[in-house]
Amino acid sequence: HAIDVSREAFWCDKVTGLSQHSWLRAIGWYTMALIDTLDQVDNKDHKYDAECKMLEDAFKDLVDSMLKYQDESGMWYQVVNYGGMDKNYLETSGSSIMAYALLKAVRLGYLSDDYAQYAKKAIDGICERYLKTKEDGSLSLGGICLVAGLGGNGRRSGTVSYTHLTL
């Protein structure tokens, strides 16, 4: 989800500069940005065909890659590439973002209708796991990441060590 082009940060791969941990919300924001951009580009005159094709291919590749990480509950883990690891958890906001991106792409015709089932499964998983009715009848939604980030001085490496901080 991050890169240090200097390759000096303690959390980055010293060859690529990339963070070794993939955060769901970062991936979700990127996925959402791709489909939202495709929706906004005015390409009626086909002036941007090459650019739109590049965005569409990136979107489809990302979605297909992320579906491999979708938990049987329908949700995705906060640190995607460490699903099921102790202290990692199924995260609500990123799973919601992925469901949004999938449904929007189906509606716009960038993905086949078959992809809607993955979004529905995510929404159902969120509701079953984290949507609760309080005593006063109001709803409460949990499992939302409270804090995540990379830091300096050997702290906040992006691992699951602090993913237990949720709403």
Predicted region positions:
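Loop-centered beta-sheet repeat module
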Residues: 1-35
